[in-house]
């Protein structure tokens, strides 16, 4: 009876194979064989030797303990004996790489460190039965404390997840199972974003169960295996040493690939039709004719991938794609050896297709880039938001976006750059301001030309603001050889650098122990100016019973119209908006005296605000209010105030 086995080691012209019954056999080596490959082992091909050879195999097994452990992991994945109740496997790559096993409720049932850094991170912490999102948040916090995550830059966390094969097969509705799993991953991303702020950007990707098997075979995380496959797709021959030793972001930067490139495709099947799979997927030799040449190379074909693929089932190839191995160097012809040459026509100029991933997009919740909200990598600038919004955290009106990075032309010639935006736009290429239409407008095309050289990367920056109603933004190019098109992600490379600081709501407050704003006692952030201290003054040990306060920061409005600002106070008060003094009554006023001043303001912009108040020993009281045609009179809320 033929067996299924995994190649443990190759020695000379022979391969040592461990079969499903955990026995070791030797078979003749064939082209394409490599360690870790699953093959058919016909009995008539097993090399029969005397007993001492079998003993030698046992000795060899001791010398290849690491490989044997890897094979045991494969057996655990491929056999029905793996842990019960497992819903999904999740690999997390920060710099440490960790493997989580979770149940249907999203609780951690096991956590395995995949490298030494990960072992150090989880030391002394109990994660079992903790919800996965909570466990990951805890790991991120530990990583921050240990300096693994730098809070002064963007840190990507790659979360690669595979639905358990048994769970998927037992589900009555596979489509529903996949949908629920995707919703689970979306929830993880949202939880981490909410808990960790904008310095940590979680990226989740769902892959077939076979990715877990291949990752185990190669002793890497699913995320790293995904990176390997992506780079191989674009022609990068990444070594196993690089894959294991470098951080994922270092690998991607080295080869000019953006993080978002990993998420453009839906991974519903392995990139190649013939990859190692479980015993339950083995194709019968009765159904697949096997010639003597490829008898040892027939491999299992996935028939139960978690996601439904529209592609036809793959047929086993004669020479399956090996796992992570270097491509052989071509052997030159021997000296004097006659070689035939065929004349070839003069090739056309080479088109320099890039390996970019898009531009860095900084999104702001107003029109003048002062209320930073989040950053992401946009594959290209081709947006038609209509009367919607780029993100739930951004209002549908009065927002702005700044895209930065580099652009790589395919040809050396004069390029025309086009913008189509509703509303304002500015475009710089190679430091030159090509388009400057910073005004509210319906969707309008503008263009300008500049000479560029093929293969050279030029700085590019596009700024855009949305005023009200419809919103759209597009960036295109054309040249003599380049037809007009949206600039593709392959020719765009995102910039890097620290994130803009997010605004803190409220106003910066300075408290003084006199009425002249000289004896500063302390500073703090006040949510709003709405105080009734009475005789319980905020400043103690006053020289003459007087104190004063200065509030400074920024203010924005919801509407574009004239606003009236009101102060209700029992001391002196002054108010500046946009450096204009609109209220000036610096004297001791009666109880709850009201003053007001007016100024025209535009929605979506921040204006400087300064308020000064002094108390002359009377019960202390001050409020800052506003009103307009559409704004009811109220205390200016914290959400419209921003501390310096």
From Swiss-Prot:
Protein location: Cell membrane
Compositional bias annotation for Polar residues: 302-328
Chain ranges on the Cytoplasmic side, renumbered to this chain: 1-56
Stimuli inducing this protein: Up-regulated in pretreated yellow poplar (PYP)-grown cells.
Gene Ontology cellular-component annotations: plasma membrane
Region (Disordered): 302-359
InterPro entries found in the cross-reference section: Anti-sigma_RsgI_N (IPR024449), PA14/GLEYA (IPR037524), PA14_dom (IPR011658), RsgI_M (IPR055431)
Transmembrane regions: 57-77
Keywords: Cell membrane, Membrane, Transmembrane, Transmembrane helix
Extracellular compartment spans: 78-644
Residues covered by the PA14 domain: 354-491, 502-640
Domain of life: Bacteria
Topology versus the membrane: Single-pass membrane protein
Residue ranges of domain RsgI N-terminal anti-sigma in the record: 3-50
UniProt free text on domains: The PA14 dyad binds strongly to pectin as well as to polygalacturonic acid and alfalfa cell walls, but to a lesser extent.
Subunit and partners: Interacts (via RsgI N-terminal anti-sigma domain) with SigI3.
Biological function: Anti-sigma factor for SigI3. Negatively regulates SigI3 activity through direct interaction. Binding of the polysaccharide substrate to the extracellular C-terminal sensing domain of RsgI3 may induce a conformational change in its N-terminal cytoplasmic region, leading to the release and activation of SigI3.
Name this protein carries in UniProt: Anti-sigma-I factor RsgI3
Species in which this protein is naturally found: Acetivibrio thermocellus (strain ATCC 27405 / DSM 1237 / JCM 9322 / NBRC 103400 / NCIMB 10682 / NRRL B-4536 / VPI 7372) (Clostridium thermocellum)
Gene name of the encoded protein: rsgI3
